[in-house]
C-alpha cells in the first residue's frame, strides 16, 4: 500500500472518529447541545417525505453496516466467504447508498426551490448538504469502482 491508501483508508477514519467523540463531549460540556437550525417541516411536507424517508432509511442501514465491519470484522469476513451472501450484501448496501443519495438530492432540491424553506435556509445548510452529497457520491463511486468492498473494508 502506498502513503495515500494508508492515510485515507487507515489513519483518516480513526481521526474522524476521534474528532467526532471529542467534539461531542466538548459540545455537551460547553453548549449543552444548543441547536440553532430552524425547522422547515411545517412549510411543505410532500417533498420532505420523499426526501427524508429514503435518506434516513438508507443512512441508518449504511451506518450499521459500517459499524458492524468496524466492530466485528472477523464475522463479516466469515459471512462473505460464500459468494452469494457477498453479492447480496454488496447489492443491498449499494441500493441503500443510492436511496440515501436520491433522498438527499430531493431534500436539497426542496431547500432550493421552495420559497418558504429557502427563507429559513442559511449558507451553512447548503454547504453541509453539498458536503454530504459529495461524500455519498464518492462512497458510491468507490463501491462501484472497487468491487467487494465489504470484504476489504473488514480486513
Please provide the spans of the model-predicted regions:
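Alpha-helical transmembrane segments
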Residues: 22-27, 104-107
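Membrane-interface helix-loop junction between the first two transmembrane segments
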Residues: 24-43, 74
Amino acid at each position: 500500500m502506498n502513503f495515500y491508501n494508508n492515510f485515507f483508508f487507515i489513519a483518516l477514519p480513526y481521526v474522524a472518529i476521534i474528532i467526532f467523540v471529542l467534539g461531542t463531549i466538548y459540545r455537551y460540556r460547553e453548549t449543552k447541545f444548543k441547536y440553532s437550525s430552524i425547522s422547515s417541516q411545517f412549510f411543505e411536507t410532500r417533498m420532505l417525505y420523499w426526501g427524508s424517508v429514503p435518506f434516513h432509511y438508507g443512512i441508518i442501514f449504511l451506518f450499521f453496516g459500517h459499524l458492524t465491519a468496524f466492530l466485528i470484522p472477523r464475522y463479516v469476513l466469515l459471512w462473505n466467504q460464500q459468494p452469494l451472501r457477498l453479492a447480496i450484501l454488496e447489492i443491498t448496501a449499494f441500493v441503500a447508498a443510492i436511496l440515501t443519495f436520491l433522498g438527499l438530492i430531493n431534500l436539497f432540491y426542496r431547500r432550493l426551490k421552495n420559497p418558504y424553506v429557502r427563507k429559513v435556509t442559511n449558507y451553512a445548510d447548503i454547504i453541509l448538504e453539498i458536503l454530504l452529497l459529495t461524500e455519498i457520491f464518492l462512497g458510491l463511486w468507490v463501491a462501484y469502482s472497487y468491487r467487494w468492498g465489504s470484504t476489504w473494508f473488514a480486513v
